[in-house]
Amino acid sequence: MTIRAVVRGVGHYLPDRVVPNSELEAIVETTDEWIRTRSGIERRHFAAEGQTTSDLAARAARAALEDAGLQPDDIDTLIVATSTADLTFPSAATMVQAALGMTRGFAFDVQAVCAGFVYALANADALIRSGQAQRVLVIGAETFSRLMDWNDRATCVLFGDGAGAVVLEGTESAGTSADRGILATDLHSDGRFKDLLYVDGGSSTGTTGHLRMQGREVFRHAVEKLAETAHTALEKAGLGAGDVDWIVPHQANLRIISATAQRMQVPMDRVILTVQDHGNTSAASIPLALSVGKARGQIKEGDLLVTEAIGGGLAWGSVVLRW
């Protein structure tokens, strides 16, 4: 028998404030048409003043626990994927642990920017397979609205805030690709491309930084690397693109998503899309899409999913799982 990390529950949380493209027209030189044409984004959510990343994460976590029928102390390990933790330290994960009232297990953050949730899933899968954890709560949460340079129309219109969470549980299986759970993971990074997407301050610099991005170069790397890592993960699982029920991509922008799907030879009607409503929520985008996809009735038990993401670093990767 094989131990598989099976999804037992999902949940998400979006801040109350919805910011349509029309609102950004008053802040920066842009138009609704310009934003939609280049990104597919129509609106995004912004956290309220005083609302932190860990606040969003805790709300999503509670929703996922409820969906799984579990209590906080049923969880062995809590992982938060984020680039916008409340403080330099302690970790956002320990703050969420406290907010949930967890009194057992351990918690830590994963920082791989937009690829963070994929990295966190891979970590959770390894912990479960090795027997170090039975139930892992994996959260992606971000408040990227606080990193924006509101004079840079190429970036400030793209990002939003939100959180999504998944509960994974170790379950015995026959170890076939038909069994539920995470089937394969594939992770990469290449620091040579660190200047393509970064924040120019913060942390130990003692300054306040803003997000900087070379959009054309990021697009080129994203489409190539996302399709490649997805195919690699599928090969590890003994599967191909034709077996995929849903691609659940990092919701960076519609152009990257559609170009990657085309390169993978997967039609867009098999791609979960939320970017139009959420914008780019970095590490939160995939768990948000998983939760929304389930709520819409798109993702069903037994479906084969591929999640793929790329972020600053550059860091990228994919996970193949049977829902």
UniProtKB/Swiss-Prot annotation:
Location of the active site: 114, 250, 280
EC number: 2.3.1.180
Pathway info: Lipid metabolism; fatty acid biosynthesis
Listed InterPro entries: ACP_syn_III_C, ACP_syn_III_N, FabH, Thiolase-like
Gene Ontology terms: cellular component: cytoplasm
Alphabetized GO MF terms: 3-oxoacyl-[acyl-carrier-protein] synthase activity; beta-ketoacyl-acyl-carrier-protein synthase III activity
Subcellular location: Cytoplasm
Start and end residues of each stretch annotated as ACP-binding: 251-255
Keyword Mitochondrion assigned: no
UniProt entry keywords in alphabetical sequence: Acyltransferase, Cytoplasm, Fatty acid biosynthesis, Fatty acid metabolism, Lipid biosynthesis, Lipid metabolism, Multifunctional enzyme, Transferase
Function noted in UniProt: Catalyzes the condensation reaction of fatty acid synthesis by the addition to an acyl acceptor of two carbons from malonyl-ACP. Catalyzes the first condensation reaction which initiates fatty acid synthesis and may therefore play a role in governing the total rate of fatty acid production. Possesses both acetoacetyl-ACP synthase and acetyl transacylase activities. Its substrate specificity determines the biosynthesis of branched-chain and/or straight-chain of fatty acids.
Assembly description: Homodimer.
Similarity comment: Belongs to the thiolase-like superfamily. FabH family.
Domain text: The last Arg residue of the ACP-binding site is essential for the weak association between ACP/AcpP and FabH.
Protein name as catalogued: Beta-ketoacyl-[acyl-carrier-protein] synthase III
Organism field: Cereibacter sphaeroides (strain ATCC 17023 / DSM 158 / JCM 6121 / CCUG 31486 / LMG 2827 / NBRC 12203 / NCIMB 8253 / ATH 2.4.1.)
Originating gene: fabH
